[in-house]
Amino acid sequence: MANTDILEQLEQLKYFLATAPANWRSEQAIRKFMLPNGEYVSCILWKNLFHITGTDIVRCLVFRFQAFGRPVKNIKKFEEGIFSDLRNLKPGIDATLEEPRSEFLEMLYKNNCIRTQKKQKVFYWY
């Protein structure tokens, strides 16, 4: 992949992250951005708030590291570190804490935004 392609993809991701909640259609629940590896990052509208999952945050960071020539060698350790940092974000202020198999988690799981329906935080977009 050429450097200009990578830089363009980084700019597109940056633009998506900055603008995904804008110009939302009333019937829309999820807006997706496809990363070069075929995975998606999603902006989710739920109960009039925009959200992003920890899984999607990890996906964004893995792509950015790869784009800058620093591929993640141990994805499990990398994820553990990111999720450890995300624990500092507080439910009700920075995130919603969803109970196992909640309606919201079920929707996120069906749309490949999360890997498990265990109790977890889903983060507010802004």
Question: What does each model-found stretch correspond to?
Answer:
Residues 16, 64, 85:
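Residues that form generic nucleotide/phosphate-binding pockets
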Residues 13, 44, 61, 82, ...:
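Generic structural hydrophobic/aromatic packing signal, biased to beta-strands
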Residues 75-126:
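Chromatin/DNA-recognition segments of nuclear transcriptional regulators
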Residues 36-74:
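Conserved, ordered domain cores of eukaryotic regulatory proteins
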Residues 1-41:
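Eukaryotic partner-binding/assembly regions in large regulatory complexes
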Residues 3, 23, 37, 48, ...:
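Detector for Asparagine
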Residues 2, 6-9, 53-57, 61, ...:
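Alpha-helical interaction elements in eukaryotic regulators
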Residues 24-31, 48-50, 70-76, 101-107:
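Short, functional N-terminal and low-complexity linear motifs
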